[in-house]
C-alpha cells in the first residue's frame, strides 16, 4: 500500500475537526523506491490549493473573526446561520417572525413622538377684561395710578403675542411696574392639539421648570430601560422581556392620561419610557439574531422605517384626537392586544439565544416551527432537517459554560474597546442632532410641522442611503463617512454663527438683504445635512454594536449602547433649561467630539457578511483589519512535512 503524507495546514485557533485534509498519495517508482513529493503532487494541484486558501483569507479580510468564523471547512461544526438553511427555517416562517418583531416598533415610535407635542408651550397671555383700574389681570403696585394701569394693560395686550414659557419671569408679558398675573392664563392653542398638560396646569413662567423636568425624566426612563433590562434579556430570554413590557405599556399609558396632577404625569411618563425601551431592545435583539449575514442590514433598516412611519402616523392621530389625554390612550391602550403574542407557537423565542444557553429542546421546538411554516400544511420535514434537529447539540457545539463573572469580563479588552467607541459615537450622534435647527424654528404651527416633518424625512432618507451603500462599502466606511459629514455640517454652521449675529443687527435685519437671505439658505442646507448624517450615524452605530457583541452578553452590551444614545437626547432639555444660553459653546464641544469620533471609528472591525459572535471568545476576535500591513499571499506552514506520525505508513 502506498504511503500517504499530510500536506495540509491545520486550522488556526485549534479548529477541532476543522483541519484541511490535503493528504496525497506517494506512489513508488519503477525501481521500487518512493519518489519525491514533487514527483507525486503536480505543481498545478498545489497552486490550486494555495489559491483556494488565499480566497478564504480574502473573504475574512484579515479580521480575526472572519478567519475563525467565515472560513467554510466541511468537517467542522455548522454555524447557526448554516443550521437555519439546513433545517429550512429561512423563508415565509422567518419573515412572519420578523414582521411580528417589527410591529411593536410602531408603538415605540408613537411614544417617542408624543413627548415634543405634550411639552410644547402654547402662545399665552394673562387673562384680562376691560381696562378699569385693577381689572387688567395684573397685580398693581401700591403707588400705581389708574391711567398707568390702563396703559400697562394695553402694553400687556401688545406684548402677549410673543410670550413663551421659556421666559424667566414672563417679563415680556408683564406691564411695567406690575408683578405677576393674578388670574388665569389664556392660551391661543397648539399646532395640532387644543391643549396639553402645560395649559391644563399652567406650567408656565415660574412653573415652567416642571416641563423641562418631565422631558428629562422621559429621556431618563428610556436610558434606564435600555440599561437595566439588558441583563434580564440575557438571563431569562428576549421573548419574556418583550411580552412583559408590552403588557405593561397599556396600563401605564392609560394611567398617565388619567393622572390628576403634573407630578403623577411625570412619574408615569418616566415609567412609560422605561417600558418602551425594554420593548425596543427586545425586538431589536430578536430581529437581528434570526437573520443570516445578508439579511441583517435590511431587517434593521426595516425596523427603522417602521419607526419613521410611527412618527408620521402620530401627527395624523394628533390632528384627529385634539385632546392630549385621548391621544395618550390612543397610542398606548392597543399595546394590551400584544398579549396575544404569548399564544404558544406564535411569537417565538430567539433560537440562537436558546442554543447558547444550552436549552436544546426549546431550540429544537423553535426551529421546527419555523421550518414547518415554510412547508405546505401537513408536509413533513426532510430527512436532512430531521437529522440536524435531532443532532443539534453536536451540530452546533456549545461553550463550556454560558455563565461568567464581572471580573472575567474585564479581561476582554477588545470587547470593551468596541463598546466604548460605538457608545461614544451613538451618544454624539444623538446629542448633536438638537444643534441642527433650520431658520424659522419658532412656535407657529407651520414651524412645528416643518421641524417634525424634516426630522422624520431625514431619518427616512438616512435609511435609504444606508440600504444602498452599506452592503457595498461596509459598515465601518459608511459610519466614518456619516460622522465626517456631521462634523463638516457643524463646523460650517459654527462659522455662520457670526453672520447670524452681526455687529450691526439693524442693517443686517433689513428686508431684502441678499447676504441675510444667503445666510439663512446656507444654515437651512447644512442643518438638513447635519440631521441626515447624524441620523445615519446613530442607526449604523447601533447595528454595528449588535454585530460585534457576543450573544451571551448582547442584551447588556447593546442596552448600554442604546442607553448612551438616549442620554445624548438630554442636550435639548439642557439647553432649554438655560433659556438657550451657551448654545454656541455646546455646539462647539459636540463638534469637537464628532471629530474625535472620526478618529476612533477607524479602530472598529468590519462586520459585513460576517457571522455573529456567540461567546466572549468570539467577540474578542472582532478586531479591525490592518490599515498598513496586507495579509500574506499564502499561509505559511512552519511544521515539517513528516513531523506528525501518519498511521497509514
Swiss-Prot record:
Induction: Expression is activated by RUNX3. Repressed by the oncoprotein BCR-ABL; BCR-ABL misregulates expression by inducing a switch in binding from RUNX3 to RUNX1, a repressor of 24p3R expression, through a Ras signaling pathway.
Cellular localization per UniProt: Cell membrane; Vacuole membrane
Comp. bias intervals (Polar residues): 24-34
Record bears the keyword Cytoplasm: no
Region of interest called Disordered, as start-end residue ranges on this chain: 1-70
CDD domains according to UniProt: MFS_SLC22A17
GO CC terms of this entry: organelle membrane; plasma membrane; vacuolar membrane
Cross-referenced InterPro entries: MFS_dom, MFS_sugar_transport-like, Sugar_transporter_CS
One MF term in the entry's GO annotations: transmembrane transporter activity
Principal localisation: membrane
Domain of life of the organism encoding this protein: Eukaryota
Residues carrying a glycan: 134, 143
Record keywords: Cell membrane, Glycoprotein, Ion transport, Iron, Iron transport, Membrane, Receptor, Transmembrane, Transmembrane helix, Transport, Vacuole
PROSITE patterns: MFS, SUGAR_TRANSPORT_1
Gene Ontology biological process: intracellular iron ion homeostasis; siderophore transport
Membrane topology: Multi-pass membrane protein
Membrane-spanning parts: 211-231, 240-260, 265-285, 300-320, 330-350, 414-433, 448-468, 477-497, 526-546, 557-577, 584-604
Compositional bias of kind Basic and acidic residues: 47-57
Similarity comment: family membership: Belongs to the major facilitator (TC 2.A.1) superfamily. Organic cation transporter (TC 2.A.1.19) family.
The protein's role, per its UniProt record: Cell surface receptor for LCN2 (24p3) that plays a key role in iron homeostasis and transport. Able to bind iron-bound LCN2 (holo-24p3), followed by internalization of holo-24p3 and release of iron, thereby increasing intracellular iron concentration and leading to inhibition of apoptosis. Also binds iron-free LCN2 (apo-24p3), followed by internalization of apo-24p3 and its association with an intracellular siderophore, leading to iron chelation and iron transfer to the extracellular medium, thereby reducing intracellular iron concentration and resulting in apoptosis.
Protein name according to UniProt: Solute carrier family 22 member 17
Record organism: Homo sapiens (Human)
Name of the gene this protein is made from: SLC22A17
